[in-house]
Swiss-Prot record:
It comes from Pisum sativum. Pathway: Plant hormone biosynthesis; gibberellin biosynthesis. Substrate binds at K241, K459. CDD domains: Terpene_cyclase_plant_C1. This is Ent-copalyl diphosphate synthase, chloroplastic. Belongs to the terpene synthase family. It is an enzyme of class 5 (isomerase).
Amino acid sequence: MFTHFSTHFHLPSSSSLFFLHPFYKSSSLGAVSFVAKDKEKRCRAISKSRTQEYEGVFQTNVATLKLSEINVEDVIVIDDEEEQDIRVGLVNKIKSILSSLEDGEITISAYDTAWVALVEDVNAISTPQFPSSLEWIAKNQLQDGSWGDSRLFSAHDRIINTLACVIALRSWNMHSEKCDKGMIFFRENLSKLENENEEHMPIGFEVAFPSLLEGARGIKPLMCPNDSPILKNIFEKRDEKLTRIPKEIMHKVPTTLLHSLEGMSGLDWKQLLKLQSQDGSFLFSPSSTAFALMQTKDGNCLKYLNNVVKKFNGGVPNVYPVDLFEHIWVVDRLERLGISRFFRHEIKDCMNYVSKIWSEKGICWARNSNVQDIDDTAMAFRLLRLHGHQVSAHVFKHFERNGEFFCFAGQCTQAVTGMYNLFRASQVLFPGEKILEHAKHFSAKVLKEKREANELIDKWIIMKNLPEEVGYALDMPWYANLDRIETRFYIDQYGAESDVWIGKTLYRMAYVNNNNYLELAKLDYNNCQAQHLIEWNVIQTWYLESRLGEFGLSKRDLLLAYFLATGSIFEPERSHERLAWAKTTALLETIKCYVRNEDLRKDFAKKFNDHIDVRDYSIARRMKRNKTEHELVESLFATIGEISWDVRLSYGHEIGYDMHQCWKKWLSSWQSEGDKCEGEAELLIQIINLCSNHWISEGPSMQSTIQHLLQLTNSICHKLSCYQKDKELKGISCQENITNSEVESKMQELVQMVFQKCPNDIDFNVKNTFFTIAKSFYYAAFCDSRTINFHIAKVLFEKVV
């Protein structure tokens, strides 16, 4: 599974780059261990700065790199106790957030609050039903006279919020000075609408804004302009859109139009009330529901608005509740940031909540909805499936028409994030799920076309780096996506609290976009990286003492072996698995390189078997290290002994005999089959699981499942290795070959076996090792050497700042 490195890649030197702090102990052949000393602080070393030269990054849909040099000019010594206190504090803050998830933490919309403030008391005349909403408006005008998001200026957002608030205050003859200030802002900034990206225009702006203008003209002091070319253009768009609204249909079946009823004329409220949501709202929109209450005096509308106004102390958001949206997106962010392991229990609760509400027609942003959208459905589908819940791919048939997929019924265009999440969901497919294959091809085509046209702008969110996020997904298929690589890039892409969502107005989701998540992710990443650099030092020492270089293993191959292990298993507490994986891979490559013909293979296998003493399978620990013709066999034995000894110290289990048997099985196949031997993946899987303290039941049904998984993974990984060798020989990329080969169907079967829960199932951690190994082989076969060099430099040696 190795590929040749670019000559531009300079390996870090063990002696010059990294050091072990005196409080760290490590065997040259074993895992890193930590020795505590009373009242003394442990430290970690991590590179602070490097000289790098990047050229042609992400060209022709794949990352390329010219890395002239990696060196360390300085080191940062991190106070471990202080770091631990910060990390614990952040984890506790986030746990508190996750335990408090309810209907959604969302910012207030001045526009919607204004509509609520306009409602007249249902039991009185000329009295506001919600005086606290008027209070909120009066208290939340910005210094420039506008209302809206205070941290991001959007002319569309500020204009519609400001006009709505001025109308509300004027309607009740309140705060004339605030109204005047608001109208000055309105007139001075109206022209800015012309220069803004239409993709970032609030939802339904072209219908809602003209309705407000018409209402404002009935209030004399407002003096709204009526001769502006911009306004004329908006009214034309309004008229065009209204002619396309199927009013007959909107009165009969639930559609997204229920979310934007405010200001619309000619509505049959008797029919529309039949489409009301269970909570009394019209598709969870306070402004739409407020308008409905004005027209109908409906008690359920009043009940919904009373609850929301009370919840938000007078103001109301642009949509509420958003419970499903929040639960799903929070889990996605935590997982991609690489910190989900701190919140396993809370994430399980989140997914159980979503699972209870999931329907065969899909979901939307809130529970008990008669309208579904592909964005929330795709995100929920993907996460539910990956967390072992039973969900059918047939759900996506509700979002497909005439060969195309849409976000909502009746929608004409595809939003970038909707297609992006559909693309991500479509990759988690089981055998025979044609609808997901179709969804994958369609969404990929849409996204690639938008990328080529430089149109990766979304109408639902303004985020830090959507083009790079989508580009990563397009260029790195899920089967090849190693966890640590994704996390390293996503930490740079995640905007945290700077990301803004687009509804009827701009809004923020404090529990989805949270600085605490990003801070913990950065701290944890650098902490993990620090340990990885120490382990890389250990691996290099082991490499020198084992003299593997003399048998043909290059340092480049050694680094790739460690990178594949670290990219897949990154957690500090899993050092045994990571080091065992890297050393096993290095030994496999060395043996295959040094022992080439069949006679030598048989001789090597015989020497190994002759050394095995089942009564004392730690014999290798006492073998002399003087150079002999059997040194490679001795290095193998010594490594097995050291790995088993470290595991015994940590978990109290003796795995030496089992490791010998695993190697014996592989050598037996390899001596007769040579390059045709399919057992490398099996050897890695068995050793990783032995080192992980995850023990496999001996029951016949369990063993049958394990054998099937082994056969499947062996076949996949062997074919990927063949593709990789072919790629290296021909000097070409084999990406298309992988995509069009039988590997895809076998990967689908493997995904189903790993992620679909069955009665009396084996431990998921054991099953997931099979998929983890398969992904590492897929990655090595899929990516070219420049891409791998770039990933190694970024993931292992570039500190997150």
